[in-house]
């Protein structure tokens, strides 16, 4: 694949007639779960192939069973061994695929599998999350007919063969990035405007903050560059320590039924500046809530009730510290927020976990008034 960065942070990709899977960067592939999504697209070009084990954030046991069960419906067999997934393909077209769980990557995988299959496939218990919608919008521009985008049932009519079409597409903005900056503003009692927020993936989050007492202004909706996603600009006002803890627990759910699962962690520093005690229930992952307790190192009064629930007492006077990042993106970025809210100089080590999820984060935070220096410690 020819990859070329263009001015304006655009990326041009050109696929060759034949892919060289033996040249795949295995070390890079093992650092992320996105390598799993190669199966749904490569199954149309190869009778057998292998890809490296999927990696990503260390959040406890993360099964690939949903991918395996759904891809089996398309005639795909997956066996694990010697650090790789070994894939075999005997194509068949299912009329209906019921997902074992409503996950983002498994939905994307199955949508791509259906996109080049003959006929129509109905996908039930699909994720309607923002990244799934972007994949669907992209495939629509390539000629794939997809109905039900944003819902839990997708109807995909494949193009039956290779797709050879030049297109330009702009992925929508990331609501999790927006949540990071909003959480930072609240934890540091700052007044900032976060522009181009995908509001459909932030509505309940903003309602929760409203009932905490946060004051904010929101512009009318306008469209993202993809012509589909609704955006707003949100201006966060200083709260001056007047926020109150919610009586009800704060927990995530599968979109569109609740708070986004990757937005939930950013309620930890928000709860820390609220008056009162907050219960956060992170039921999705086996041990992500355990990583939240690292926030005690920067002064947060946090109590681990069990591997999924933490109680946070506030308000908090954050303190400086020298801390190593946990091996999970969102919990690691919480420590950065706490350090920005603390007086004095803190050190956050092994920041690769954060860097792989947020581009030029230190520079952007410095433009808002933070003082962050990235250095190599040999």
Where are these regions (language model features)?
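Short, structured segments at the rim of ligand-binding sites
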Residues: 1-378
């Amino acid at each position: 694949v020819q990859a070329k960065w263009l001015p304006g942070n655009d990326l041009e990709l050109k696929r060759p007639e034949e892919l060289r899977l033996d040249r795949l960067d295995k070390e890079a592939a093992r650092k992320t779960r996105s390598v799993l999504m190669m199966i749904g697209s490569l199954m149309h070009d190869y009778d057998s192939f292998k890809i490296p084990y999927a990696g990503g954030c260390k959040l406890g046991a993360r099964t690939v069973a949903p991918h395996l069960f759904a891809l089996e419906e398309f005639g795909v067999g997956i066996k694990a061994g010697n650090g790789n997934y070994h894939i075999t393909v005997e194509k068949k077209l299912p009329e209906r695929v019921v997902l074992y769980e409503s996950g983002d990557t498994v939905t994307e995988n199955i949508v791509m599998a259906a996109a080049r299959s003959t006929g129509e496939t109905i996908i039930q218990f699909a994720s309607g999350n923002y990244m799934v919608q972007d994949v669907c919008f992209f495939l629509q521009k390539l000629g794939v007919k997809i109905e039900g985008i944003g819902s839990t049932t997708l109807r995909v009519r494949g193009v039956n063969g290779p797709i050879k079409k030049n297109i330009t597409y702009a992925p929508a903005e990331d609501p999790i990035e927006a949540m990071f900056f909003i959480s930072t503003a609240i934890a540091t009692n700052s007044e900032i405007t976060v522009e181009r927020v995908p509001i459909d993936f932030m509505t309940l989050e903003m309602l929760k903050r409203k009932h905490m007492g946060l004051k904010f202004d929101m512009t009318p909706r306008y469209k993202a560059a993809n012509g589909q996603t609704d955006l707003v600009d949100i201006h966060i006002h200083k709260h001056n320590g007047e926020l109150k803890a919610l009586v009800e627990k704060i927990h995530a759910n599968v979109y569109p039924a609740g708070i986004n699962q990757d937005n939930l962690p950013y309620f930890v520093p928000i709860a820390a500046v609220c008056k009162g005690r907050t219960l956060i229930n992170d039921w999705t992952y086996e041990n992500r809530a355990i990583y939240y307790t690292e926030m005690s190192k920067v002064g947060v009064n946090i109590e681990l009730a069990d591997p999924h629930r933490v109680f946070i007492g506030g308000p908090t006077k954050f303190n400086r510290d020298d801390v190593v990042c946990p091996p999970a993106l969102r919990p690691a970025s919480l420590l950065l927020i706490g350090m920005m809210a603390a007086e004095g100089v803190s050190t956050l080590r092994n920041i690769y976990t954060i860097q792989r999820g947020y581009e030029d984060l230190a520079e952007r935070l410095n433009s808002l008034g933070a003082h962050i220096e990235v250095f190599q410690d040999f």
